[in-house]
């Protein structure tokens, strides 16, 4: 088996995790107490879902995951929520005091007390696997726990499980909507270790997903639950091929191979289509070509970033539901002819497609319509660079005055770490510029003229 362990860190990670496991359980017909009624074995007795669930002798299905937070309230919601019987109590780890939006508290003082316990639990989960293929890490980089403890845990995972791939689903601070003043600090410090210790990081931001909810689902005042359920659909589509059988299945390591041209450039845009409310879906026939086009719309992106400002380096399309390879090939051919969607000239093909026959499931009572087919796109575009330049700019404004820095230094950080992380991101911005620049020969000539 190719198992995957999910790690949910901090409030954002845990709440996204709740939405994901809720959806997985629905997709596999697993009840909130972990039982799977035998008449409803969805894969016809096939055990592909064991990549995400382990089965006990009593026939209970336990998620291969761990929830980790430095303060108890969010984890307590899981402990008392609908799915409290699904998780093993040891999988829910919470500390006593908060990271207080402070990267240094999450990474140095409070985080290091809990990280060994977490690694111990992860070790138990890993021993329970026959062929662990990697980790999915869910966190946000604006707060203290997700950024500080998140990067600490990733660093430790690199030491303990060097060869296993790590996929991050990371909520980045939005351009306009902010939940903390020190977000730019936390994000820059955290991205510094994401660069080093994740293989692929899918970027999400709340503002972009709010806009999608308002625009496509007609929700006037979206809540975090609405956002998380949308994110869960994306993650479910990505992992569907690990959990079901299909015509073109995609492994976790395949993502890396196809999406990451250079190790540092592994920050991805994601989008999902069709996002459509139940009332509208009744009147629309969503063909493969239509949903493929929708996935490339700038408005479908799950992070505030306009792909028209950059070029695509690679792109992964994961279809699910009633889709055949012929339709996919036709849609991709159409996309290639569009002038607006530009690829870098050193990457001529640029598309990786996956097809899975399990149609998308929706959580009952939720705003998304039940559709026959859906597509999730993960793409590597040079436009992602603008997210980092936006962050860096905010970081610089604060750091020039050394505002709020004493909170970090007081928790045992050194000021040098700020400048080190900032330089690393400056280098990343430069990497994005160079990758998007004209072709290989052009670069060579330019250098010749300069010297």
Curated annotation (Swiss-Prot):
Its main location: cytoplasm. It catalyses: GTP + H2O = GDP + phosphate + H(+). GO terms for biological process: microtubule-based process. GTP binds at residues 11, 71, 144-145, 179, 206, 228. One of its GO terms (molecular function) is GTP binding. Belongs to the tubulin family. This is Tubulin alpha-2 chain.
